[in-house]
């Protein structure tokens, strides 16, 4: 049985901290599976006509999270999607009712590598602080238990090519589908 057949239209939701590769790996997965790629942050910008930093500035994080939940609810009603989510989508418990309609994949990248990837990125409102490393570590501490609720954890090291990460995900999905009754996420190390 092919992987696409085994998935039977099940959406793949990529979660992880900002800079973890959700966009890059999401596009690769979608292309490989013949799925449609969707980025929740891009959808939020399209729906509101504002950038993420503008939404944070005018509506605060709480306002942004409400819009994010509405967008996720809509996205979850479709099938055959690979969805790159915003890093904080796991915070709101109600979002899990939508995420769990698909296969949730946590892209787990070490903090130093995330900082390297995000250096100079002005489109990350939560990192516009005097100490981005401290902020990123705090976000990790706040969200780690939520990310751990994913069906699959993929540990990614700095030197790993996104194509390799995509292949590792594709190779392990069948066993995750087979063992979906298990409550702990499968873990794939590099």
UniProtKB/Swiss-Prot annotation:
Catalytic activity: shikimate + ATP = 3-phosphoshikimate + ADP + H(+)
Residues the entry annotates as binding Mg(2+): 23
Function per UniProt: Catalyzes the specific phosphorylation of the 3-hydroxyl group of shikimic acid using ATP as a cosubstrate.
InterPro entries, sorted: P-loop_NTPase, Shikimate/glucono_kinase, Shikimate_kinase/TSH1, Shikimate_kinase_CS
Subcellular location: Cytoplasm
Residues reported to bind substrate: 41, 65, 87, 143
Gene3D superfamilies: P-loop containing nucleotide triphosphate hydrolases
Pathway: Metabolic intermediate biosynthesis; chorismate biosynthesis; chorismate from D-erythrose 4-phosphate and phosphoenolpyruvate: step 5/7
One BP term from GO: aromatic amino acid family biosynthetic process
UniProt keyword annotations, A-Z: Amino-acid biosynthesis, Aromatic amino acid biosynthesis, ATP-binding, Cytoplasm, Kinase, Magnesium, Metal-binding, Nucleotide-binding, Transferase
SUPFAM superfamilies: P-loop containing nucleoside triphosphate hydrolases
PROSITE patterns tied to this protein: SHIKIMATE_KINASE (PS01128)
Quaternary data: Monomer.
Cofactor note: Binds 1 Mg(2+) ion per subunit.
One MF annotation (Gene Ontology) recorded for this entry: shikimate kinase activity
Location (main, coarse): cytoplasm
A single Gene Ontology CC term: cytosol
The organism's place on the tree of life at top rank: Bacteria
Family of the protein in this entry: Belongs to the shikimate kinase family.
Name of this protein: Shikimate kinase
Cofactor(s) the record lists: Mg(2+)
Enzyme class name: transferase
Residues the record lists as binding ATP: 19-24, 124
PANTHER family, per database record: SHIKIMATE KINASE, SHIKIMATE KINASE 1, CHLOROPLASTIC
EC nos: 2.7.1.71
